[in-house]
């Protein structure tokens, strides 16, 4: 019996440590450590309200967006009520953005950046901003969001422009992402893996746009400073631990 106990003890310790590490990544309670603060990180969500955010083209936040248990939740059941994409009050140029997201069954959403808020000229965030796709990809035995059948439209992709390495967690689990852009060098990370890299605003960027659904949107992907948006696609989606660092 003693040998059995001694054999399982290191395994139990290892599992405990692994669980704690995972919790640290995804359950920081929307708060920054002193080290993060000293390193220049800023929280974009305080866990209790949508302070610092508004719906695109308006000054308020519509009832579709709720804060529940330390999470921003777009309620699909409120579809048709006042909603719209949620955008930051501030603009960002060179930045490192991190957050956690979770999507509903067959859900669709996105994280859109470099959004130029001029609703009289650009009616939607995606007319100027660049998107990291959020999607229920489905599995070989379960149908996900139909958009996932399209190359470059799956979770973590640079939407309609570049496919990414597929590392999204199963439906119902949180995904941790990072979007980093410095002087046009764009990198995507998901769940600890580097999933995509490209350069914005050069000749190759223009070529990608020219064969995409954005080819007839003259403002798309042209602004080098802008707001961050969380997309209202009409499906339940959840966000937490939203933080950014200016670079």
Predicted regions and their residues:
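Carbohydrate-interacting regions of secretory-pathway proteins
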Residues: 18-247
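Bacterial Sec-dependent N-terminal signal peptides
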Residues: 1-28
